[in-house]
Structure formats: C-alpha cells, structure tokens
Amino acid sequence: MLNVARYDVFKLSEAVLAGQPARVQRMLDGLQAEGEAEVLVHWALAEDIRALKRVKDAMAAGKPLPMALRENRIWGPRERLFERVLPRLGDATTARLLHAAHVVDGIVKGLKAPDWPADGWQALQRLAMQLCRACMPTPPRPR
C-alpha cells in the first residue's frame, strides 16, 4: 500500500513561516487525522524557531544574512521566508517562542504544563499559531 499522505510537516513549516493561519490550521487538522506523530510535528515547529534564533544570533554577531542562512542549512523556499520574517522578529518574541516550544516538547511527551492544554495536538496548534502570528506579513490590528 502506498503512503499518499496529503499533508506533511515540511509544508506545515512553510505555511507557518508564511504567516498563513487558515492553511496552518487545515494542515494541523489533516496531519492529526492522518495519524502523524505529535513529536514529529513538534520537531518541525521547534526546529524553525531554533533556526530563526540561530540566524538572528549570527546576524547580531556581524555575519551577513546569506552566510547565516547557508550555515544553518536554510535554502530554497525557506530562505525567502526567513529573509522576510527575520527583520520583524524581535528578541523578546524569539525568547517567548523558544520557551513555548520547550513547554510543548514536554506536553507531547506526556507532561503537564500550567496554562497550556494537556492535549498534545491542542498544544501544537497553540505553538503553531504563535509562530504563525509572529511571521505574518503585517501584524494584526488590536480590536
């Protein structure tokens, strides 16, 4: 039998970095319905957050963006997404995202965390949406 999964974590990563919340939600729902492992979805999201932090740190140390991206193995469509997102991503936001990824890592492995859903998929959705909002082309206006 062929594996004809409609969604994959790498496309999810691109949708999150592109700041497309509706697409991200649809993909998360699809990955869950297809039985994808929560830890794999978490890995993809956390790896993007860690890569954003590494590239920001390299740029802060004086490295040009193209070199920082290459050293972190970011190329192709992700390279363009990183180039667009990085200037808008502040240090405080990056720190919050790293902490959230750490919390969700525990949740998908069965640990509880205060102020976070106990269900792994709900926690992944929250993490994905936090990252997605940080990557949106224009920040949402407060209501």
Model-assigned labels for residue ranges:
Residues M67-R143:
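Charge-biased C-terminal accessory regions appended to nucleic-acid-, cytoskeletal NTPase
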